[in-house]
Structure formats: structure tokens, C-alpha cells
Amino acid sequence: MKIESVPETVPALEGKLDASGKRFAVVVSRFNSFITERLLLSACDGLIRTGAAKKDIDVVRVPGAFEVPAAARTLASTGKYDAIICIGCLLRGDTAHYDVIVNEVTRGIGQSAQETGVPHAFGVLTCDTLQQAIDRAGLKMGNKGFEAALAAVEMASLKATVGRQPSAVSKKQSLASSSVRHRNHKGARPRSSKKRR
């Protein structure tokens, strides 16, 4: 197998970490609040540091992580928000309950994002131990709430950027119509205003 040189890269669209002028909703689970409150504070800090105004951040509290997707979908469906940040903390127990909830929460958040078209950032911790959750809520492993906020800002920016880009189809149609106009103008004879008899 021959390895060839890497071809020139195609320009890529990327979102920017600029939350100014955008609205965000943060859905946070009250269950395991000693963890989720740390995630929430850090998520709001991330939004404000990237330019979001406090008045453009709405916080919605739900009983547990299982309720996060339904609330996120309700908020996304209003059309008021540029992105939704989903925050919760699930700790593995002795039964299969953890696996069921993790799967449903993950599926529900993803489905809400896909069906509404509003970016959703996943800030739900799924940990085996309490120590793992503590580490991810601001100690050894950073803060996943802050990371979710940055992801939400970038995806909201990317969505806005993509929305301003002409589609490939409209580019082709625009090129084709300008080509036709150019040919018609170039080869056309001036029409006489007099009628032939």
C-alpha cells in the first residue's frame, strides 16, 4: 500500500465561541443537586464568558435526569432559543435502573436536537462512582457544565453560519441563470419598437 501526500484541505465551516446576541436555555436536574448545581454554575459562567447576556439565559429545573429531554424538547419547540444545555448526574447503582435511564436520557436529548433542529449540548454525567462525578464537576477533570456551554455556543454559531450559506443547489441555479442572462445579452439583437406590416 502506497501512502500519498495529504491533499489540500477543503475550507471547513466552524462555529465561533461567541454567544453575544444569542439565547440559551439550561435544563438542570435537581437529583444529585450537589453535583448538578456545580455544573449549572459553570455552564452559566461559560455562556457569560463567551458573550451571552444574563437576560438571555433561562434556567429550567426538573426533578431528575429522566425529565431533562422532555423539558429540552418543550423549550426547543418554542423557537426562542439558539441552543439548549442539558445538565444532570447519574450514578451507577446495584440494579439495571442506571442503564435504562442513561439510555433513555441520551436517546431523548439526541432525538430532541434532531427533530427540532435546535442544538442541544450534553452535560449529563454518567458515572460509576460519586468521586468520578465530583472530579468532573470542577475538580480533577475540569467541569463538564462549562464544556457543555462551550459546545452549545459553538453549535449555535455554526447553525447560524450554515443558515447564511447558499446551498449547493441554489449556487448551481444562480450560476445557470446568470450564464443564460449573459448569453442572451451577448447574442441578442435590439428589438425594434415598430411593428412589421
Where are these regions (language model features)?
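Glycine-rich phosphate-binding loop
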Residues: 67-109
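Generic structural signal for well-ordered, non-membrane alpha-helical segments
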Residues: 17, 32, 36, 40, ...
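Structural motif
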Residues: 25, 58, 82-84, 118-124
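C-terminal binding/interaction regions
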Residues: 2-5, 22, 98-99, 103-197
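Glycine-rich phosphate/diphosphate-binding loop of Rossmann-like nucleotide-binding domains
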Residues: 12-63
